[in-house]
């Protein structure tokens, strides 16, 4: 889960990472009031989960509360790379002597953690990596040893931070590592990490991505979920513990196992080339259990997608046998009743497939069309979606 900047800074404050005071608001008048309360020049910052806010006009300096009001009025509702600004962070402006970059992330290729540090902060880190790679340090982090202040100082030194700030930077970097580990993050990034004229080290910005797989031990993270920004179908799927990702096609997909579902997406996309360019509408993995309740929940999500014209159910029976899957489909259609109003192409294979096909045949549901193979099922689903 990606966090807004203000949420990242809430975690920073929790772990004593120094930053600038401020508050979030959805109102231009409140932005003015916050600026008056701070009593100093402020930054008015769009809260969107995408980079490039400054270039898009989403970050403005306000010398007075009236300036904050004007900037807030202009920024709210702004479209930044497809993200509409609904919230603003009004934070005390800071004098900046130098800007640095620091992040902790997963290094999946090497199966470890990675610290990245650079004296070239305040600009896109991809640009630094491309134009000044020698100025960007990439330091592997031992998962057991972690990052204490001594190792944090090494990271800062390798990032070419000035000698006079190494000790102060090390304290903040070690605290950012604490955020990364204790909050189960997959990314903690500060750009810029700044030195002020009086040699304070402050995290002026913050980007944090939390690992959803750790939600069971991080109950407090639920408050960070932005339901307004989450697709309602994805939200419904999550409430039913379904692995669902909405796409932009017309063929709804249900399968058991991520690998099979990914293959199904490819086969449907290929078949769709013959039927007007039809594409998959979603990724939906129901996992190992295809009970009536699970199948009904999956179909309920997909059938509520107005873009879906047909559904392809592609299941390989393993631990869950095909007869159980077939019974699940039949009962799911009973549960949904009139809400099930789009054709379902069903391909079953694997454990007890003949019994599963018999159950579907005897049910004789008008919406269900059986397919013998994945290719024929994908072709039929694409054909139906193109009608």
UniProtKB/Swiss-Prot annotation:
The gene is sucC. One of its GO terms (molecular function) is ATP binding. GO terms for biological process: succinyl-CoA metabolic process; tricarboxylic acid cycle. This is Succinate--CoA ligase [ADP-forming] subunit beta. Binds 1 Mg(2+) ion per subunit. HAMAP family: Succ_CoA_beta. Residues 9-236 form the ATP-grasp domain. It comes from Mycolicibacterium vanbaalenii (strain DSM 7251 / JCM 13017 / BCRC 16820 / KCTC 9966 / NRRL B-24157 / PYR-1) (Mycobacterium vanbaalenii). Keywords: ATP-binding, Ligase, Magnesium, Metal-binding, Nucleotide-binding, Tricarboxylic acid cycle. Its EC number is 6.2.1.5. Pathway: Carbohydrate metabolism; tricarboxylic acid cycle; succinate from succinyl-CoA (ligase route): step 1/1. ATP binds at residues 45, 52-54, 94, 99. Substrate binds at residues 256, 318-320. Mg(2+) binds at residues 191, 205. It catalyses: succinate + ATP + CoA = succinyl-CoA + ADP + phosphate; GTP + succinate + CoA = succinyl-CoA + GDP + phosphate. Disulfide bonds: none annotated. Belongs to the succinate/malate CoA ligase beta subunit family. GO terms for cellular component: cytosol; succinate-CoA ligase complex. The lineage of its organism: Bacteria, Bacillati, Actinomycetota, Actinomycetes, Mycobacteriales. Succinyl-CoA synthetase functions in the citric acid cycle (TCA), coupling the hydrolysis of succinyl-CoA to the synthesis of either ATP or GTP and thus represents the only step of substrate-level phosphorylation in the TCA. The beta subunit provides nucleotide specificity of the enzyme and binds the substrate succinate, while the binding sites for coenzyme A and phosphate are found in the alpha subunit. Heterotetramer of two alpha and two beta subunits. Its cofactor is Mg(2+).
């Amino acid at each position: 889960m990606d966090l807004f900047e203000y949420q990242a800074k809430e975690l920073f404050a929790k772990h004593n990472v120094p930053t600038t005071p401020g508050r979030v608001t959805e109102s231009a008048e409140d932005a003015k009031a916050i600026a008056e309360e701070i009593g100093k020049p402020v930054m008015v910052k769009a809260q969107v989960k995408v980079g490039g806010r400054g270039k898009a006009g989403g970050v403005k300096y306000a010398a007075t509360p009236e300036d904050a009001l004007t900037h807030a009025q202009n920024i709210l509702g702004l479209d930044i790379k497809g993200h509409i600004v609904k919230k603003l962070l009004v934070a005390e402006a800071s004098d900046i002597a130098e800007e640095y970059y620091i992040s902790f992330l997963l290094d999946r290729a090497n199966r470890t953690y990675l610290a990245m540090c650079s004296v070239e902060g305040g600009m896109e880190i991809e640009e630094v990596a491309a134009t000044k790679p020698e100025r960007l340090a990439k330091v592997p982090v031992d998962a057991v040893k972690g990052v204490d202040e001594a190792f944090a100082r090494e990271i800062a030194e390798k990032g070419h931070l000035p000698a006079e700030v190494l000790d102060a930077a090390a304290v903040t970097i070690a605290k950012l590592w604490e955020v990364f580990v204790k909050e189960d993050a997959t990314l903690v990034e500060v750009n810029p990490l700044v030195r002020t004229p009086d040699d304070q080290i402050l995290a002026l910005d913050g980007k944090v991505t939390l690992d959803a797989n750790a939600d069971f031990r991080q109950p407090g993270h639920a408050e960070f979920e932005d339901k307004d920004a989450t697709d309602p179908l994805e939200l419904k799927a999550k409430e039913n513990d379904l692995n669902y990702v909405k796409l932009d096609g017309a063929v709804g997909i249900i399968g058991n196992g991520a690998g099979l579902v990914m293959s199904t997406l490819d086969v449907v996309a290929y078949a769709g080339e013959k039927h007007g360019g039809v594409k998959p509408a979603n990724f939906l993995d129901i996992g190992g259990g295809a009970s009536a309740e699970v199948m009904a929940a999956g179909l309920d999500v997909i059938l509520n997608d107005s873009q879906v014209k047909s559904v392809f159910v592609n299941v390989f029976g393993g631990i869950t046998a095909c007869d159980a899957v077939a019974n699940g489909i039949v009962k799911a259609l009973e549960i949904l009743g009139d809400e099930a109003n789009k054709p379902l192409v069903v391909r079953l294979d694997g454990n007890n497939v003949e019994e599963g096909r018999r159950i579907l045949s005897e049910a004789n549901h008008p919406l269900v069309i059986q397919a013998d193979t994945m290719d024929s099922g994908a072709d039929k689903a694409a054909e139906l979606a193109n009608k």
